[in-house]
Amino acid sequence: MTNTTNAAAATGLTSTTNTPQVSAFVNNWDNLGMWWFSIALMFVCLIIMWLICCLKRKRARPPIYSPIIVLHPNNDGIHRLDGLKHMFFSLTV
């Protein structure tokens, strides 16, 4: 049977109760003037999320169809047809 006091020393693990400065830092977060750090961290996360959304939008696939611009022989102007609709029209006619 091992001694419990020597087991902690043998493994090198210590309890967090032995480090009072950690709990003091967490409890005195507002007193240390760290409120600005929380706000800055929130803004950094928002900027990262905004950049991720912009990069995903730029990497989006282009549309399947491309617009077709047709100039009619009677010269009544330029007509823009969507390629996909034009393809369906040509299949049905």
Curated annotation (Swiss-Prot):
Cellular localisation: Host nucleus membrane
PTM characteristics: N-glycosylated and probably also O-glycosylated.
Membrane-protein topology: Single-pass membrane protein
Entry's Gene Ontology cellular component terms: host cell nuclear membrane; membrane
Entry's transmembrane regions: 34-55
Taxonomic superkingdom: Viruses
Keywords of this entry: Early protein, Glycoprotein, Host membrane, Host nucleus, Membrane, Transmembrane, Transmembrane helix
Family: Belongs to the adenoviridae E3A-1 family.
Descriptive protein name: Early E3A 10.5 kDa glycoprotein
